[in-house]
Amino acid sequence: MNSSGIKPNHHLLQFQSPLEIMTSQIDHLVLGAEDLSSETQALESDFGVPFDAGGEHPVMGTHNRLLRLQADIYLEVIAANPTALPQRTRWFSMDDPKTKLRLNQGIHPLCWVLQVEDIHQARKNCGYDPGEVIKMSRGDLEWQITVPKDGGLAEGGILPVLIHWPGGRNPADWLTLSPVQLTHLEITHPSPSSIENILQRLGTLPEIYITQGNPALCFHLNTPKGSFALKSEL
């Protein structure tokens, strides 16, 4: 345990520069599924709304379906594509045996993705190691995203993946606005003050609640069929 109260691992760093508040916003929430089709259909039934089509990520060997929540935030359901071999370790810890076991038991939150203006500066100053910045594209969409070489997630997904859309467009621009709303994202951690300090460094994020306890990530959603709390214990 270091002075910040966080157990050291390869994803966390000491702050290397004076505190600098960055501009950021939640970009999207990531739900992992073992089978994309059947588990998206189950969510559509639970929520009472259809998901939009997503696409494939050939480099990662994954595919997804999307749902616009509000403003510029969307929900992504992602799964390994059984017809595609990845060209590298899959992102969002999807090749990790623990993640595979969790997804075998049903759909679970994997992580959340934070949109930043300057991804290289944010990566340098965020106070943890979100991974290397890689370029991705699908159709006319292009983006930069942080992915560790081992495909892992910082603090198991509690700390955000960073993303930048160079063209200023993210999928929410063309998705159908749904009645499903993110009320808040709940983070539970043994040292909540340490997580809060890092997130404050990344910018004001009013949709995030941080509580003390065993590591967990929970998406709280309001839908036409009621409120849902989608939770992963990490």
Ranges and model annotations:
Residues 57-60:
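A short beta-turn/loop motif at secondary-structure boundaries
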Residues 21-26, 32-50, 62, 69-234:
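Glyoxalase I/VOC metalloenzyme domain signal
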Residues 1-20:
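N-terminal amphipathic/basic-hydrophobic helices that include classical n-h-c signal peptides
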